[in-house]
Amino acid sequence: MSHLGLADVHQSEDATPDLESFTGFGNSAAEAFIQSLAGMVNQGDVETMIRAQKQMLQRFEKTNEMLLNCNALSQSRLKSASEDFKRHVKCLSEMKKDLDYIFRKIRIIKQKLQSQFPAIYAEVQPQRSSLAEEAEDDTEAQAKKTAETPAPAAAKPVLSTKKSAATIEYVQMEEAVDNGTVEIENELIKRVCSVETANPNDSSDCTSEDTG
């Protein structure tokens, strides 16, 4: 009976393997699964993927650095452009004020001339359009002639009938306003002021502000 009992014990031990023999090397089931899975993966492919990821990371870092530099440059350029724009807007507003002042003075002078010399003003008024057209035609002819010939050609003078001193001053004033010549305009304003000063019936004065 003792021999049979020992034989049964040996058979039971042989039929049930231990944990170490099942998993191998005394590792747990999870570790054994991971090792088996790692053995199925090619290590060369894994290293290639890691290198590709590192290269892409470096490219992304360089791209981010370039974008940061571009943003900084754009901000500096925008700041300088904004300052220039504000300065130009301020300059244009000042120029508009000056032009408003000049045209207001011109209207005042025209009203004075109309009140002092109504007959001459009515006679000269229809000639404004013809004088402007003649000046425009002369300008176009001069530009065309200059384009055709290399040598500069002298412009033809505009002939006008001299009615009186006040009429001449008025016609020259209109030409100066049309051409936008500031120096001639100031000189003509001085002449008109001298004509007004010579007239004893006119109580208005002409200061240096009129020529400003």
UniProtKB/Swiss-Prot annotation:
Any Pfam family the entry gives: KxDL
Compositional bias per record (Low complexity), positions renumbered to this chain: 148-157
GO biological process: lysosome localization
InterPro entries (alphabetical): KXD1-like, KxDL_dom
Chain intervals for the UniProt region annotation (Disordered): 128-159
Cystine crosslinks: none
A Gene Ontology term for the protein's cellular component: BORC complex
Protein family: Belongs to the KXD1 family.
The protein's name in its UniProt record: KxDL motif-containing protein CG10681
Originating species: Drosophila melanogaster
